[in-house]
Amino acid sequence: MKISDMALRDILPLSLTGAPCVSIQRQAMLEEAICLLVPYLETMTDSLVVAGDKNEPLGIIGGKEIIQCILASQGDISKIRADGIMSHTITKITGATKLRELVEAWMKTGRAFSIIPNSIGGYSAVSARKVLEICKGAMTDMAVSELPKKETITFKPNSTAGEVMNLMIKNRTRRVLLEGTNQYVSDRIIIERIATDLAYLQNPAGFLQLPVIGFGLEYAKVLPKDLKINELASIMFGMLHPYVLFRGHVISPWDICLAALSERMLEYG
C-alpha cells in the first residue's frame, strides 16, 4: 500500500504525538519569541504556537515570521507582540488524516507544520522531520537522482544579512548556499545571531547591513553516491540540521515530503 494513502496514526501509532507544541502567549514580546524559538527550529517542533487567553492556538511563529518582521522594520521592533507578527494560518490535523492530505495542506500553506490533539489535552507538532521518520521506514526503489531538480539559490561572500534574508523570502526557502561551496546560511543561523545580542532589534537596519559570512555558516552533507529515498530519509532524520548536496543540487526535508506522495513509496512489508 502507498504510504501516502495511509492514515498517520497507522503509520506512526506510537510517535505521532510525541513532540508537544511549544507555545508562547499572544502578548509576549518579539525578543521573547526569538529566544524561545531558536532551540526548536529544524527540530520535530520547528515553530512556536501563539496561544490565546484560554491557551487556544491562534497562530504560528517560525523563522519566516521573524525574518519578515525584521525586513519590514522602520525602527525599534523589540516591543512588537507575538500576535503582531504571527501567521494566522494554522493547520490542524487528526490521526485519521492521510499522509497525502497532510503534505497537500502544507503545499497550500507553504509551511511544513501542523498541530494535532494529544492525549494530555494539548497539541503536538507535526513537521517535515516527522515525514522523514515516516519515509525512512518505507519501502521503495525510488532513487535520489530521480528527485526533481530545482534551482540552487546562492549568495556571494560579500552579501549582507538583508540581501540573504530577501533571497529567502523571494524564493520561499529557509537555506541559501554560499556560491561555489557546500556552506550555507539558514533562517535558524540568522535568528541565532539576533538572539546573541537582542540590541539588534532596536536597530534592525544596522543588522541588515552585517556581512552574513560572519554568522557562522554550516556545511550541507555532500552525498557521495546515489541512494534510495528511504535511505536518504534515514540519514537526514539522524542529522541535527538536515540539508544535503547531491551532484550540485540541494535536497531539504521538503523534497522528501514531496517524494512521499510517489506511488513508489510503499508500506514496508
Task: Give short role names for the model-derived ranges.
Residues 1-19, 62-91, 101-109, 119-153, ...:
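Tandem CBS (Bateman) regulatory domains
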Residues 22-45, 52, 92-111, 117-118, ...:
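The conserved cystathionine-beta-synthase
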Residues 56-59, 114, 122-124, 180-184, ...:
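Conserved glycine-centered beta-strand/turn positions repeated across beta-sheet architectures
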Residues 1-61, 65:
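Hydrophobic, helix-prone linear segments
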Residues 174-175, 188:
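Basic side chains
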